[in-house]
Amino acid sequence: MKTAITLLALVLVTRASAATTPTTLFDFTMKTVDGVEQPLSAFKGQVVLVVNTASKCGFTPQYAGLEELYQKYRDRGFVVLAFPANDFLWQEPGTDPEIKQFCTSKYHVTFPIFSKISVKGNDMAPLYRWLTTQEGFAGAITWNFNKFLIGPDGRIGARFGSRVDPVSSELTSKLETILPKK
C-alpha cells in the first residue's frame, strides 16, 4: 500500500512539474518597459524576433534595422520583442523609462520593449534560460543584440549573433521562409 501511494505521489509531482515546464515562447509572461505584465501568448501565431538590447553598445544602431524590419513585415504577422539587458560591460545602465525614452526618441522604435532583464548568469531570466537551452540553438548569450527568430508555433526557427544586421539577407531570407505567404 505504501508503495502504491508513493508511486501515485511521484506520478502527480512529475505531471505537475511537466505542466509548468515551458515548451514555447508563448508559455512566458514578461514585464513591459511600462511595468505591465505581458503574456507572450498574445503573440501566438506571429513570427517573433527576440533580441537582447543595450543603449550604449557598438551594435545599438541595430535598433534602426529592427524598426525597419518590423515596419516592413508587421502586416504579415511579424513582431520584434526587445529585452534590454545590462550584462555586457554595463552598456544598458538606464532605468526602464530612460530606455523607452532613448529607443523612441533616437530610433523611433514602435515594436514592444520589455523591462530590463539579465540574459546570463545566476539571475538569467527564465525566458533566456529556455532560449539558450533549446536543442539546435543552445549556447550562452555572448553579447548584446543576439537574435532568436521564433515561428508562429512559438519554437525557435533560427538564431543569429550580434554581428548579423537585422536587415541582412541572412536574417531576412530565413524570416521570409517562416512568414505566411502574401
Where are these regions (language model features)?
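Sec-dependent N-terminal signal peptides
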Residues: 4-13
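Local sequence-structure signature of Cys/Sec-based thiol-disulfide redox active-site neighborhoods
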Residues: 44-49
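Structural microenvironment flanking redox-active thiols in thiol-disulfide oxidoreductases
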Residues: 59-124
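Thiol-/selenol-based redox modules, centered on thioredoxin-like
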Residues: 126-182
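Amphipathic alpha-helical repeat scaffolds
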Residues: 32, 52-56
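N-terminal "domain-start" segment that seeds a small globular fold
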Residues: 19-41, 126
